[in-house]
């Protein structure tokens, strides 16, 4: 399980930036997420025909960030992650709809990003303070 500081940070945010790469060309997209604490994974909704999902289906190794936007160096917080994207099922749909009940009306395709590595930067704990998570 991730350190409590990761979980606390992720609970205060709701958008991740997802990076994909196909044919040596990177791409990025923003996605609303629900975070599954027990399994260290993001649950997102996105149409399978979007560029980022098409690329992730070709190459499921993805990376991304969740950040706090601030101009104050002492308040910088952010998480970088690497993981693997897979299509979600009923459990992932339940988790996502718990956070975003209005999404039911759109009946989106649900995906899970299994976090294999993450780094959390939190300058409030001291400049350059970083925590790391690696899935075992």
Task: Please give the residue ranges for each predicted region.
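Extreme N-terminal tail/first-helix region
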Residues: 1-16
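Hydrophobic alpha-helical segments typical of transmembrane helices
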Residues: 2-5, 52, 92
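Short secondary-structure boundary/capping segments
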Residues: 7-8, 34, 54, 102-103
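Short beta-strand segments
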Residues: 13-48, 56, 62-67
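Short acidic (Asp/Glu) patches
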Residues: 46-50, 63-68, 90-103
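Helix-adjacent hinge/juxtasegments
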Residues: 52-83
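Charged, gly/pro-rich active-site loop segments
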Residues: 73-136
């Amino acid at each position: 399980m991730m350190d409590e500081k990761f979980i606390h940070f992720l609970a205060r945010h709701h958008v991740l930036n997802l990076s994909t790469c196909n044919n040596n060309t990177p791409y990025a997209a923003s996605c609303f997420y629900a975070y599954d604490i027990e399994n260290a994974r993001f649950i997102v909704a996105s149409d399978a025909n979007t560029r980022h999902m098409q690329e992730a289906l070709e190459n499921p190794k993805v990376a991304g960030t969740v950040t706090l936007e601030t101009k104050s160096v002492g308040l910088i917080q952010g998480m970088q992650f690497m993981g693997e994207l897979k299509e979600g099922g009923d459990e992932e749909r339940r988790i996502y709809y718990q956070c975003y009940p209005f999404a039911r009306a759109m009946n989106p395709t649900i995906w899970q990003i299994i976090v294999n590595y993450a780094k959390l930067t939190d300058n409030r704990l001291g400049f350059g303070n970083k925590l790391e998570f690696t899935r075992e």
